[in-house]
């Protein structure tokens, strides 16, 4: 199975598409959380796969005009079992991850701004069992499950304001790069492996100071093999000349 191979060769990719984590819907942010935890926690990945399978079955049951409540209870029990495990591990992950993220953002931005991340989950205020019971009538009307960890989300803040609305392109990009560098460090700590780091055309829309600080960050023994792509050969060479390491340039 493909899931059996996740985590054996850890890889962290930083690319312009990462802005979707800030700008797109909650599913992209959940995918980010899952992509980190699954690298080192096989039980989490198994619970996540099982949860999504049961969720799909429960939603199919809700779409039927007539169904056996016994089946619904079976699905509820399974959702609660897997969902609670996922919730606890996501909450613990955010508590451990945010300080690492903050460290990288403060370095890249020279501590010019403050950031924070807020984990949003239905399970923060109510038990999953109570939520399913409370929302059963709504679920039957809408014919899908309205509560659970499949609705989890993250809010990103810059100086107490939503990053999506108040952050410049440079600030948003600095935040995303910080998230991926924090992901690298977090996975390395958990797996004791050095992931490969791919920097795919990430220096656009960043001022020289922030570019230099990113280069300084990755130019130490905390990082292993690094691949950097850029559309401009001269800019690429200027960036690499600041790295006190051997490098090879490939032109395509």
Model-flagged regions — what are they?
Residues 33, 40-92:
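Long, non-coiled-coil amphipathic alpha-helical linker/lever segments
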Residues 67-196, 205, 209-227, 234-243:
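Conserved NTPase motor "head" modules and their coupling/switch loops across ABC/AAA+ ATPases, GTPases
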Residues 200-202:
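Walker B catalytic acidic pair
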């Amino acid at each position: 199975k493909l899931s059996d191979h996740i985590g054996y060769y850890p890889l962290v990719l930083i690319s312009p598409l990462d802005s979707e984590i800030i700008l797109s819907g909650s599913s992209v942010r959940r995918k980010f959380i899952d992509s980190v935890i699954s690298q080192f926690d096989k039980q989490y990945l198994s619970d996540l796969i099982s949860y999504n399978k049961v969720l799909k079955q429960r939603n199919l049951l809700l779409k039927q005009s007539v169904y056996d409540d016994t089946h619904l209870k079976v699905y509820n029990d399974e959702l609660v079992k897997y969902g609670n495990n996922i919730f606890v591990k996501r909450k613990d992950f955010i508590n451990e991850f945010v300080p690492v993220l903050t460290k990288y953002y403060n370095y890249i931005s020279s501590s010019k701004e403050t950031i924070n991340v807020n984990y949003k989950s239905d399970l923060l205020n109510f038990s999953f069992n109570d939520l399913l019971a409370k929302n059963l009538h709504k679920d039957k009307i809408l014919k899908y499950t309205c509560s659970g960890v499949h609705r989890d989300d993250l809010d990103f803040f810059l100086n107490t304001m939503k990053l999506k609305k108040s952050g410049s392109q440079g600030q948003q990009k600095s935040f995303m790069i910080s998230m991926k560098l924090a992901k690298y460090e977090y996975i390395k700590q958990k797996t004791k492996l050095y992931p490969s780091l791919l920097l795919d055309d990430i220096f656009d829309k960043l001022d020289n100071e922030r570019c230099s600080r990113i280069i300084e960050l990755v130019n130490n023994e905390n990082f292993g093999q690094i691949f950097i792509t850029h559309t401009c050969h001269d800019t690429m060479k200027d960036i690499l000349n600041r790295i006190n390491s051997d490098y090879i340039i490939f032109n395509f």
